[in-house]
Structures are given as structure tokens and as C-alpha cells.
């Protein structure tokens, strides 16, 4: 959500060039680094830019979203349409991880929501950055409840392969869910993710600190942390 809130609805030549310089080129560079890493560590290398390595899927997803954003902006209800696309994509077995397409379509509502909130200036209009004690308390309770549910119902989550649901990398049938209601599970998980995202942002301190400016370098952390792991 946050990574797409700064996207413009009608990118021109400058914005399109930034897609290449800020996303595509780093993706290709780090794919090359991953190829070398695999060769040194595992003794083999299978370079394939259509299959992003580990965390690099996000760069491809972000690039694709910025390319299709002008068309999404033309729709009357972009959030509704992307939600239908996300749910519907899970029923199609031919949509896989090639060019990170399965995750791009699956997470498309979150990308669109980030742009939509920024485009309609909802943060400023509703003073969403203002700290409210009841919202802070409710957010803390939400995380406590989520943590308790994650631990107490662990056997259930493992049985339903919740981990695979959260990856958005496989269609419903590949996870073992062939029922018509599988799309409802994805919808429910997205709603839970949205609520926890709101809770998280409500707990983030509003005032600046000496380390606040480090936030602008999170892309470097994102790209490099996977090598450490």
C-alpha cells in the first residue's frame, strides 16, 4: 500500500523512464547477483529473468502496476475491479509465477488502494495522521488478538496451508482448494490484512526522530536483506 501511494495516475515520459531506472534495472542487476550467488554457494546457476528470485518478485509487481495504473485510473471503480481480478485470478491455473504475474494480480487491490488513498488525499481530508487514543488502543488489541489466534489455532492454519494462501503464488487448486468458495477465503484474508495494516500505521509514531530520514533508504534494505538471510 505505502509503496504505491506516491504513484501518479497519468505517468508521462519522465515517470516511465523512472520505472526503468528505479525498478527494472535494479531488478536485472540483482537477478545477476543472485545468479552468481547460486553458482558460488550451490555450484549451479539457472538464470531466468522471467522467474524472479526470492524477494525480487516485488520489483516486477511494482513495475507492472505502474505500467497499468493509467488504465486503472480510467475505471469508475478501480478498487472493485482489482478486487475481482485478484479473486478471479486464483481460479485460473495457467496464471503462475512467470514475471511474478500471480502475485501481481493477487495483490493488485493493495497496490491500487495505496494509489487511490493518495489520489483522493484521504489522509489530509480525514486527518488520518492525528493520533487518537482509542484508535491506538484498538490497534494494540488487534495485534494481541491476531497473535493469540495465530498461536492458538496453529494446527488449523497448518492444515489449511495458510502459508501458501498468504504467498499469493499459487492458484486455489494447487493449494488443494477446488471449491467455489476459495475466492471468499482470499477476500477474507485481504480484509484481515487491511485491518492489521491500518492498526500498524496507527501505532507508528507521528513525530520525527533522528533516525526518521533513514526511512527513505528502505529499498536498499529490502534488496540486500535477502542475501543475509
Regions found by a protein language model. Give the residues of each.
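Alpha-helical transmembrane segments and their immediate juxtamembrane cytosolic regions
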Residues: 1-229
Amino acid at each position: 500500500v505505502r509503496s504505491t501511494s506516491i504513484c501518479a495516475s497519468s505517468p508521462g515520459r519522465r515517470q516511465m523512464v523512472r520505472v526503468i531506472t528505479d525498478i527494472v534495472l535494479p531488478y536485472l542487476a540483482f537477478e545477476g547477483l543472485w545468479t552468481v550467488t547460486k553458482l558460488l554457494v550451490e555450484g549451479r546457476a539457472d538464470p531466468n529473468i522471467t522467474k524472479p528470485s526470492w524477494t525480487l518478485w516485488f520489483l516486477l509487481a511494482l513495475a507492472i502496476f505502474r505500467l497499468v495504473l493509467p488504465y486503472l485510473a480510467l475505471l469508475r471503480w478501480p478498487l472493485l475491479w482489482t478486487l475481482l481480478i485478484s479473486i478471479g485470478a486464483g481460479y485460473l491455473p495457467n496464471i503462475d509465477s512467470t514475471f511474478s504475474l500471480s502475485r501481481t494480480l493477487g495483490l493488485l487491490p493493495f497496490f491500487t488502494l495505496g494509489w487511490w488513498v493518495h489520489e483522493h488525499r484521504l489522509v489530509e481530508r480525514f486527518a488520518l495522521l492525528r493520533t487518537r487514543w482509542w484508535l491506538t488502543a484498538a490497534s494494540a488489541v488487534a495485534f494481541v488478538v491476531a497473535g493469540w489466534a495465530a498461536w492458538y489455532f496453529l494446527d488449523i492454519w497448518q492444515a489449511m496451508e495458510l502459508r501458501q494462501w498468504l504467498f499469493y503464488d499459487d492458484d486455489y487448486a494447487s493449494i488443494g482448494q477446488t471449491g467455489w468458495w476459495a475466492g471468499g477465503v482470499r477476500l477474507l484474508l485481504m480484509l484481515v490484512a487491511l485491518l492489521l495494516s491500518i492498526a500498524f500505521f496507527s501505532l507508528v509514531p507521528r513525530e520525527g526522530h533522528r533516525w526518521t530520514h533513514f526511512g527513505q533508504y528502505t529499498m536498499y534494505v529490502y534488496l540486500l536483506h535477502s542475501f543475509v538471510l
